[in-house]
Amino acid sequence: MSDEENTTYIRMKPAIRKQQILDAAVELATEKGYRNITRKDVAIASKSASGLIGRYFKTVAGLKKAIVEAAIEREIMPILAENLSIKGEETKSLSPELKEKVILYLTN
């Protein structure tokens, strides 16, 4: 049996579950790198069925977009730096101040 098959799922309100999934995804992206997360990893970390990730974020690309948006809001430098280094669409909207912080993070 896989880890996902051994996970017990608890029914939650959709907004709470979506936030739980996003929080787990942000944590994983910080630890493993933005490009290295998978739907299965996020499902296991958030104790959610992988189908819920599709329900709330449609695609892995949609989930990654939400991760970067959360990283911008929370100023999570490892995620922003990785996205900026691959010229991700989401970081094009960074404020000059935040972009400067990310560049400083990358150079230290």
Regions found by a protein language model. Give the residues of each.
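N-terminal intrinsically disordered/low-complexity leader segments
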Residues: 1-16
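Short helix-coil-helix linker/hinge
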Residues: 15, 21-24
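Helix-turn-helix
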Residues: 20, 28-66, 70
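Short, basic, alpha-helical segments at the C-terminal edge of helix-turn-helix-like DNA-binding modules
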Residues: 39, 69-76, 80-83
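Hydrophobic alpha-helical connector segments
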Residues: 66, 79-108
